[in-house]
Amino acid sequence: LYEEAELADERRFEEWLSLFTDDLQYRMPIVRSLAANDIGKEYLTGPLDISWVDEGKPTLAMRVQQLRTGVHWAEEPLSRVTRLITNVRIVEALPSAEEAQEVEASCKFLLYRNRNADNQDTIIGKRVDRMRRAGDSWLIARRTVFLNQPVLLVNTLSFFV
Protein backbone atom coordinates (compact mmCIF):
# COMPACT_ATOMS: atom_id res chain seq x y z
CA LEU A 1 0.00 0.00 0.00
CA TYR A 2 2.90 2.33 0.71
CA GLU A 3 4.50 1.55 -2.67
CA GLU A 4 1.20 2.16 -4.44
CA ALA A 5 0.84 5.58 -2.78
CA GLU A 6 4.43 6.51 -3.64
CA LEU A 7 4.05 5.55 -7.31
CA ALA A 8 0.92 7.70 -7.56
CA ASP A 9 2.65 10.60 -5.75
CA GLU A 10 5.58 10.39 -8.18
CA ARG A 11 3.17 10.36 -11.16
CA ARG A 12 4.48 6.96 -12.26
CA PHE A 13 0.95 6.07 -13.27
CA GLU A 14 1.74 3.19 -15.62
CA GLU A 15 3.65 1.41 -12.82
CA TRP A 16 0.85 2.36 -10.42
CA LEU A 17 -1.72 0.72 -12.73
CA SER A 18 0.31 -2.50 -12.74
CA LEU A 19 -0.48 -2.94 -9.02
CA PHE A 20 -4.18 -3.53 -9.80
CA THR A 21 -5.87 -6.69 -11.10
CA ASP A 22 -7.59 -6.60 -14.49
CA ASP A 23 -10.98 -7.10 -12.78
CA LEU A 24 -10.43 -4.20 -10.36
CA GLN A 25 -13.39 -2.47 -8.73
CA TYR A 26 -12.44 1.03 -7.48
CA ARG A 27 -15.23 2.83 -5.61
CA MET A 28 -15.68 5.97 -3.57
CA PRO A 29 -19.23 5.88 -2.18
CA ILE A 30 -21.03 9.04 -1.19
CA VAL A 31 -21.44 9.59 2.56
CA ARG A 32 -24.52 11.19 4.10
CA SER A 33 -24.88 12.93 7.44
CA LEU A 34 -27.49 10.89 9.31
CA ALA A 35 -28.91 10.64 12.81
CA ALA A 36 -26.94 8.55 15.31
CA ASN A 37 -29.33 5.58 15.11
CA ASP A 38 -28.78 5.41 11.31
CA ILE A 39 -24.97 5.64 11.42
CA GLY A 40 -24.55 2.24 9.74
CA LYS A 41 -26.34 3.55 6.64
CA GLU A 42 -24.30 6.71 6.12
CA TYR A 43 -22.26 5.36 3.16
CA LEU A 44 -24.11 4.48 -0.04
CA THR A 45 -22.42 1.13 -0.73
CA GLY A 46 -25.12 -0.82 -2.55
CA PRO A 47 -24.45 -2.01 -6.11
CA LEU A 48 -26.98 0.47 -7.55
CA ASP A 49 -26.09 3.39 -5.26
CA ILE A 50 -24.40 6.44 -6.71
CA SER A 51 -20.70 6.98 -5.93
CA TRP A 52 -18.18 9.75 -6.43
CA VAL A 53 -16.04 7.15 -8.21
CA ASP A 54 -16.98 3.72 -9.56
CA GLU A 55 -14.32 2.54 -12.00
CA GLY A 56 -12.45 -0.48 -13.24
CA LYS A 57 -8.91 -0.83 -14.49
CA PRO A 58 -9.79 0.02 -18.12
CA THR A 59 -11.27 3.35 -17.01
CA LEU A 60 -8.25 4.12 -14.82
CA ALA A 61 -5.99 3.29 -17.79
CA MET A 62 -7.95 5.72 -19.99
CA ARG A 63 -7.59 8.42 -17.34
CA VAL A 64 -3.83 7.85 -17.26
CA GLN A 65 -3.71 8.12 -21.07
CA GLN A 66 -5.62 11.42 -20.88
CA LEU A 67 -3.14 12.77 -18.32
CA ARG A 68 -0.22 11.82 -20.57
CA THR A 69 -1.59 13.79 -23.54
CA GLY A 70 -0.70 17.10 -21.91
CA VAL A 71 -4.08 18.55 -22.89
CA HIS A 72 -6.19 17.29 -19.99
CA TRP A 73 -7.63 20.68 -19.00
CA ALA A 74 -8.20 19.82 -15.32
CA GLU A 75 -4.67 18.41 -14.88
CA GLU A 76 -2.44 20.61 -17.02
CA PRO A 77 -0.14 21.24 -15.37
CA LEU A 78 -0.30 18.05 -13.31
CA SER A 79 -1.21 18.34 -9.65
CA ARG A 80 1.38 17.71 -6.97
CA VAL A 81 -0.15 15.14 -4.63
CA THR A 82 1.11 13.61 -1.40
CA ARG A 83 -0.68 10.63 0.09
CA LEU A 84 -0.04 9.69 3.71
CA ILE A 85 -1.08 6.15 4.66
CA THR A 86 -1.40 5.11 8.30
CA ASN A 87 -3.14 2.64 10.65
CA VAL A 88 -2.74 -0.23 8.16
CA ARG A 89 -4.47 -3.36 9.46
CA ILE A 90 -5.11 -6.79 8.00
CA VAL A 91 -8.84 -7.34 8.46
CA GLU A 92 -9.20 -10.73 6.79
CA ALA A 93 -6.98 -13.36 5.17
CA LEU A 94 -8.44 -16.12 3.00
CA PRO A 95 -8.38 -19.08 3.22
CA SER A 96 -6.20 -18.57 6.35
CA ALA A 97 -3.44 -16.28 7.61
CA GLU A 98 -0.82 -18.96 6.91
CA GLU A 99 -2.00 -19.73 3.36
CA ALA A 100 -3.53 -16.42 2.34
CA GLN A 101 -4.46 -15.99 -1.31
CA GLU A 102 -6.60 -12.93 -0.65
CA VAL A 103 -6.18 -10.31 2.06
CA GLU A 104 -8.42 -7.43 3.05
CA ALA A 105 -6.60 -4.48 4.58
CA SER A 106 -7.88 -1.19 5.90
CA CYS A 107 -5.96 2.02 6.40
CA LYS A 108 -6.49 5.69 7.06
CA PHE A 109 -5.24 8.23 4.53
CA LEU A 110 -4.61 11.92 4.18
CA LEU A 111 -4.23 13.29 0.66
CA TYR A 112 -2.86 16.77 0.02
CA ARG A 113 -3.07 18.21 -3.50
CA ASN A 114 -1.57 21.41 -4.88
CA ARG A 115 -1.99 22.69 -8.40
CA ASN A 116 -0.73 25.92 -9.91
CA ALA A 117 0.13 28.58 -7.34
CA ASP A 118 -2.78 28.53 -4.93
CA ASN A 119 -5.09 25.60 -5.68
CA GLN A 120 -4.95 23.17 -2.77
CA ASP A 121 -7.14 20.42 -1.41
CA THR A 122 -7.01 18.07 1.55
CA ILE A 123 -8.97 14.83 1.67
CA ILE A 124 -9.08 12.52 4.69
CA GLY A 125 -10.69 9.13 4.99
CA LYS A 126 -10.40 5.38 5.18
CA ARG A 127 -9.60 2.84 2.48
CA VAL A 128 -10.48 -0.83 2.40
CA ASP A 129 -8.44 -2.84 -0.11
CA ARG A 130 -8.92 -6.46 -1.18
CA MET A 131 -5.57 -7.76 -2.40
CA ARG A 132 -4.99 -10.96 -4.33
CA ARG A 133 -1.78 -12.98 -4.44
CA ALA A 134 -0.09 -12.90 -7.85
CA GLY A 135 3.05 -15.05 -7.68
CA ASP A 136 5.42 -13.42 -5.21
CA SER A 137 3.50 -10.16 -5.00
CA TRP A 138 0.03 -8.83 -4.25
CA LEU A 139 -2.33 -6.94 -6.56
CA ILE A 140 -5.24 -4.76 -5.49
CA ALA A 141 -8.50 -6.31 -6.73
CA ARG A 142 -10.95 -4.02 -4.95
CA ARG A 143 -10.59 -0.61 -3.36
CA THR A 144 -13.29 1.26 -1.50
CA VAL A 145 -12.49 4.80 -0.41
CA PHE A 146 -14.61 6.19 2.43
CA LEU A 147 -14.31 9.98 2.68
CA ASN A 148 -14.91 11.72 6.00
CA GLN A 149 -16.94 14.46 4.34
CA PRO A 150 -20.46 14.37 2.87
CA VAL A 151 -19.73 17.28 0.53
CA LEU A 152 -16.85 16.95 -1.90
CA LEU A 153 -14.83 20.10 -1.26
CA VAL A 154 -12.35 19.68 -4.13
CA ASN A 155 -12.72 21.51 -7.45
CA THR A 156 -12.23 18.35 -9.48
CA LEU A 157 -11.60 14.63 -9.06
CA SER A 158 -9.11 14.57 -11.92
CA PHE A 159 -6.44 13.09 -9.63
CA PHE A 160 -6.40 9.60 -8.10
CA VAL A 161 -7.56 9.28 -4.49
Please name every model-derived segment:
Residues L1-D9:
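Short, aromatic-enriched amphipathic alpha-helices that serve as compact interaction elements
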Residues E4, W16, L60, M131:
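Hydrophobic pocket/interface hotspot
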Residues D22-A105:
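A solvent-exposed, acidic/Ser-Thr-rich amphipathic alpha-helical stretch
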Residues I90, F109-R113, R130-R133:
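Beta-strand elements of well-folded, non-transmembrane domains
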Residues L111-D121:
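Short, cysteine-centered beta-strand-loop-beta hairpins and adjacent loop/turn segments enriched
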Residues S158-V161:
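Short hydrophobic/aromatic patches at helix-to-coil boundaries
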